[in-house]
Amino acid sequence: MNRFKSLLLITFFGISSLFAQNKGWNLDKSHSSVGFSIKHMVISEVSGRFKDFDINFTSTKSDFTDGKVEASIKVASITTDNERRDGHLKTDDFFNAEKFPEIKFVSTSFEKAGENKYKITGDLTIRDVTKSVTFDAAYNGSIKAPRGGEVHSWKATVSINRFDYGLKWNRAIEAGGLVAGDTVNITLNLELNKPAA
């Protein structure tokens, strides 16, 4: 009897695992990026990225309208290709990587906004401040993967005001404006692998 129960449990968890795997999409980090840009000295722009991040996407519909997204980003992985500036960004003037080690996003809606266009709304948390934001997302299509399954490509963008999240460092310049602008443009380029059914 115990052996029969064990077989039932193994079968149940095996089916459950397969079902979850078919719903879930695996992020290909080597072909994905989380980047940002911000005005510098009013007239130019500085860009950077986070090297350590994880994004979980699930959807069971072909039009993705039941899509759900959860993302976490390690603040300490920030890079702008300038060691001194990166160190400053990790301090309490900006992200305070020690006290607030992660940036998080959890979607609340995934709406179709045209052909291969979507509005992804959710809660973005930076420094324990949570605000609702809406990403403009473009679905770039899919292709069969050499080892089975499918590769899907997405691009999503959003702009936020850094002061809304306590990224408070501020220095004015003589010509007017700030050394670092208030608007941060965030761009995600994502490659997701959908396992074969």
Where are the regions that the model predicts?
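Bacterial Sec-dependent N-terminal signal peptides
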Residues: 1-23
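Low-complexity, acidic/polar, glycine-enriched regions of mature
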Residues: 21-197
